[in-house]
Design a protein with these regions (language model features):
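Extracytoplasmic/secretory ectodomains and luminal regions
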Residues: 1-330
Length: 330
């Protein structure tokens, strides 16, 4: 059989005469022992038959036909290699940090050898507002390899695509995802496009969320740089109490200055986007840490007051502080 089938060699002497299914592309080698010409060989695959009897003959199975050796005849049913099939096998799930999980199922008559997922921007579904009004810069499709079983039968597989594309410019935008499966013969099968919103990281702090939105706009198009600089400058106009640390305010002002340069290029724009991403992460995680510490302190104060026999009024005040800290943390 062809190598793509992964099947062992088949011996004709072990097969009873009659119908015989053989993969297209299989090579047949006949070797006869004894007196040459004692058994007549006829088959439908060679363009010409030998003029003289020969103890060997070789040919390729390219379709239905027959092989006859003496009185024994095999009717060959050539089985074509089918293209692999692949499709989603469940709903997309996501985590707060932007990790996406999408199950898929693939199958092939001789086994799936590889696969990929291609993600493209679904521009007609994008809500064209604010920085997304202008046309986006062209970007190549996202292509990620699919996980495959290390061992065992790959004729039927179910796996899970796990990927984190939270930093990609298309995060939180409509995209179309297409699965592709490949078999050993190089044939490909594709799923219908799956329309999803590409998961991004959830930013809960208002300042971090505003910075990420402006980062998205400059990655959508470099022409958004002047507008983004103006908005970031307005956001940071009164930094008192807005930034958890002075270093964050200075980092944002440096990013604004870079965006306002007339010679801003793609490399510089991408550098600024990295600064904005890191800044938003620092603000988000820092605010969470502060809220958690305030919640811990409020809980400890309440517990200590109960141990010391505080009055109902004092306990009520501390309970209100604890609830407020819990709301801030949540």
């Amino acid at each position: 059989p062809p190598a793509y089938t992964g099947k062992p060699t088949l011996y004709l002497s072990d097969q009873p005469p009659g119908s015989l299914a053989v993969p297209v592309g299989a090579r047949v080698t006949l070797r006869l022992y004894g007196r040459v010409g004692a058994l007549e060989i006829t088959e439908s695959y060679s363009d010409t038959q030998p003029d003289e009897p020969s103890p060997t003959r070789a040919f390729k199975i390219d379709g239905d036909g027959f092989i006859q050796i003496g009185a024994d005849r095999w009717e060959i049913a050539a089985t074509a290699d089918m293209a692999p099939r692949i499709q989603p096998a469940g709903e997309l799930t996501r985590t707060l940090d932007g990790e996406m999980r999408l199950p898929f199922a693939a199958s092939d008559d001789y086994g799936v050898t590889a696969g990929s997922a291609e993600i493209v921007l679904n521009l007609p579904r994008v809500e064209r507002r604010h920085g997304l009004v202008i046309d986006p810069e062209p970007r190549e499709a996202i292509v990620v390899d699919l996980p495959m079983p290390y061992r065992g039968d790959r004729a039927e597989i179910e796996e899970l695509l796990v990927e984190n594309l939270a930093e990609h410019p298309w995060a939180e935008l409509p995209v179309a995802l297409t699965f592709t499966a490949i078999d050993a013969a190089g044939q490909q099968g594709q799923s219908a496009p799956v329309e999803i919103t590409l998961p991004g990281r959830r930013f809960l702090h208002p300042l971090a969320r505003a910075i990420i939105e402006q980062r998205r706009d400059i990655l959508w198009s470099q022409d958004n740089a002047p507008r983004t600089a103006r908005l970031l400058r307005a956001i940071s106009n009164r930094p008192e109490g807005l930034f958890p640390g002075d270093g964050q305010y200075l980092a944002l002002r440096a990013a604004i200055s870079s965006l306002e340069r007339s010679e801003l290029g793609t490399v510089e724009r991408d550098d600024v986007s990295k600064v904005l991403w890191d800044l938003a992460i620092e603000i988000e995680d820092g605010a969470l840490a502060v809220a958690l510490e305030e919640l811990r302190r409020a809980r400890e104060r309440l517990a200590e007051a109960m141990r010391q026999g505080a009055t109902p009024e004092e306990l009520q005040q501390l309970m209100d502080e604890y609830r407020e800290a819990m709301r801030n943390y949540m």
